[in-house]
Regions:
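Active-site nucleophile/metal-coordination loop of metallo-enzymes that catalyze phosphate/sulfate
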Residues: 1-109, 115-127
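Short, Lys/Arg-enriched charge-dense amphipathic segments
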Residues: 48-50, 109-119, 132-143, 174
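Extended, H/D-rich, highly charged conserved domains that either
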Residues: 125-174
């Protein structure tokens, strides 16, 4: 894109983009009115939450925990005990794929679909007709209370969905 003849960013150049080391493909601007520089990650963690913290000036000495093999039994046991519901999945998954693969069983059994991703996140998917959104939010609050210390994930996310198999759809109620 940057080598295209149609790439024209006069305002960004005026702010200093063309003066950053490595941006020699841009025409230099004479009257720079902004501050500029090249940044490098400093935090140990590399997920979305840590990145946002770092943009705000907080450098994290420790990475947030991730769960490439799913969450530990003790976490899920406590979650099930406090919510009164068993869980399905417990592994890294795409949000659309997880409801495709586990949605019918969730609707049939009422078990919550718990999954993660490459980031430090605990996600709970549930059909809105089986688990109303407010109840799903309560389950997220319970998960957040459990997920502290060693298992203090960056985010706990509600992932409500609607519809019928095989056409489940995630909603914006999250």
């Amino acid at each position: 894109i940057t080598h295209s003849k149609e790439y024209d960013t006069p305002n960004m150049r005026k702010l200093g983009l063309s003066c950053i080391d490595g941006a020699d493909y841009l025409e230099k601007s004479d009257n720079i009115v902004g501050s500029y520089g090249r940044m490098q990650e400093a935090s140990k963690g590399k997920d979305t939450t840590i990145g946002h913290w770092e943009i705000a000036g907080i450098v994290s000495e420790n990475a947030l925990p991730t769960y490439p093999n799913g969450f530990p039994k003790e976490v899920l046991d406590e979650f099930s005990k406090r919510t009164g519901r068993e869980v399905l999945c417990n592994k890294p998954y795409s949000g659309t794929d997880v409801i495709r693969d586990y949605g019918e069983e969730h609707v049939r059994t009422g078990k919550l679909i718990v999954y993660t991703s490459a980031d430090s996140v605990f996600q709970i998917a549930a059909h809105e007709d089986i688990v109303p959104v407010e109840e799903l939010y309560k389950y997220c609050e319970i998960a957040r209370e459990i997920l502290v210390g060693e298992h203090g994930v960056g985010r706990v996310i509600a992932r409500p969905f609607v519809g019928e198999a095989p056409n489940f759809q995630r909603t914006t109620n999250r």
